[in-house]
Curated annotation (Swiss-Prot):
InterPro entries xrefs: KH_Mug60-KHD4
Localization per Swiss-Prot or TrEMBL: Cytoplasm; Nucleus; Cytoplasm, Cytoskeleton, Microtubule organizing center, Spindle pole body
Protein name (Swiss-Prot/TrEMBL): Meiotically up-regulated gene 60 protein
Gene: mug60
GO cellular component, one term: cytosol
Organism: Schizosaccharomyces pombe (strain 972 / ATCC 24843) (Fission yeast)
Keyword vocabulary terms for this entry: Cytoplasm, Cytoskeleton, Meiosis, Nucleus, RNA-binding
Amino acid sequence: MDSHVLAFPIPDPSTPPPEEASLYASKCDYYESDIYSQIRRLTEEKCIETEKELPVNIKLHVKHKGMSISSSRNELVVTVSGNYKNVYTAKIKILQAIPKILISKLVLEEPLENLLFDEDGYVYEDTMKHLDKITEITGAKIYIMHRSMCHDIDFQLRTDSGFSNRLNEQQSFYQRHLESTRHEFSCQKNAENSFFIVFYGDYCSVEHARIRVLALMDEIRGLSVVAIATSVSFQPILVGKAFSSTAGMKATESINIYTLPFCSDSIPRLQTLPALNSSKIIITGEEEKLQRLEEAFYYAEEHLKLFTHVTEISFVKLFEFLAYEMDELRLIMEENSSFIRFPEYFKEGGETSPENSKVKIYSSSIANSEKTALRLAKLASKYVQGKTQFGVEDNEDFLRVAGSWRRASTIEKGVSSSELSSIVSSTGSIVETNGIGEKMSFSPLKKLSIPPTEFVAQIAIICMASGVEMLLKTNGIEYFGQENTVPIAMDKASKIFYKFGQSQWHQILLEAPTKDQDFISGKKNGKLDKVKQQCRFNLKNGDILFCPQSTSIFTVDIYSDELERVIKGMNTMLLEFPAEMHFYVPEEIHKKLIGFRGEQIQRVTKLYNSYIEFSTTPFDCYGHNVLIRTPSKFSENLWAVRSLFIKTAEGLGYDIPKYLFAN
């Protein structure tokens, strides 16, 4: 079997805030002062352990020995040599042992500040004891810092997940955007005197500590605190915005509902950290109301009807989700009252087939499960795949069947195509049957004898420079990363490996929700044809194809013999991807905005090159009933249309709350 070399970066840990700049720092022995050295040592140990378990060769590459990670990213890169299945199994085992260390914050409102500090501005001793206890239970280090000392800190988590139902909608919005909208609410004076509670650790530890601190603040205010034992998979469904209000479990001004991380069993943590239990919902409020709410929870859980939706997402993208998108995944679940279950191998870290990437969505309604699948598809579209093929000599055979390269790579991995049935003949040529059953034969891509193991250092350097995951095979390279990093890696690799083939074919795969396909391609493929014309694609030098991947996702396949043309095609296609906005306008003035026979709204859509839809039922859980969509190249028009409609509503005497403005 052909040898492969897989290079992937280890998530960089965040630098902890300086204790000398904080008003308080909890006692925590779980993280070393040099967190980079701790992660590096942990990675080395896991690489040695994995190399003993699997028939692979593993090397750990360090960019700068002793260099501070604050000045350089992608410090650690692991390369694994072996067959296709083993290199990805090794990757799973290694990444499942390396936690992503990050920083989160909680903005203290003025009433809360008075509960934590005495008249002289010092933190109460009892408060420090409580925070030290939370650190001991969760494993997250806690700081109290003045806002002026937090400018250089890279906060990597949202401040709204875990309590989307906290208080009422207006108060929830205020909590989520307290820091970013202080100027809008004319609170600059308070902003200069505000304080942050900063949390440092892995995702689960940080989120458990943050929710416990919120419950502690409520307890200091005199509210009762109750923990309700609930299955993790039921929590986002029961307390999500799309279900809780109809079940009578929505938070009020006197009741707060907090949820813990839903996918904690799939997220790596340090072995020395205390075990955490996410199977509970924390509610705070008046004791009598909490008792009624607790009964409502048990009743809803017993009579809950679940709907299941299965979608497929590349297993490589699922890794990125668990490493960098956990907060967004949690928010998607909360907003759509759904639970996303990942494949079991993410929990076990064992051997798996990389093609097994089915994700199950459980929700309270079919509509919510479909919305969740759509949000996942949009999240997946942030990441792109690239390929470089060496030694392709016969361009006509390569292009004879549309997308033959894509199918050839599918055959190589042992995956059958849904559109064409393919077999490999005894002579090594590929035989396909077209839609009417006729056989079509063409020559396979030439296999070069490139020894991948001799170029481990080269792909490790490219991986460090770009942060892109790379897979080197005997006749090509595969890339995975974001749209701004994959072209960089492809360019560097093509220059290093140019000697292995005068003819290099390049390919970039973009993903998008199936419902956006008509929007991206345009009427009668007008937008697609225009992009091909701008980038000078023709049958001989490449093409852009739309290929269905699953019921919810399709792939934009861009390939050519010139890398510059492929990159230009990718950038041009991304400008045609939709940008959208939801906001609220009173239903009473919808007809006025539309105008007689739609003349008014048609003028607006033509002026701002946008699609506008009004609805009597909200598009999301925030009550927004207006949807605007436009190509990404005109994304600034979204705000112009929103401003026009809001001003029209206010001119007619309607007062629209700011928390319903846009999302």
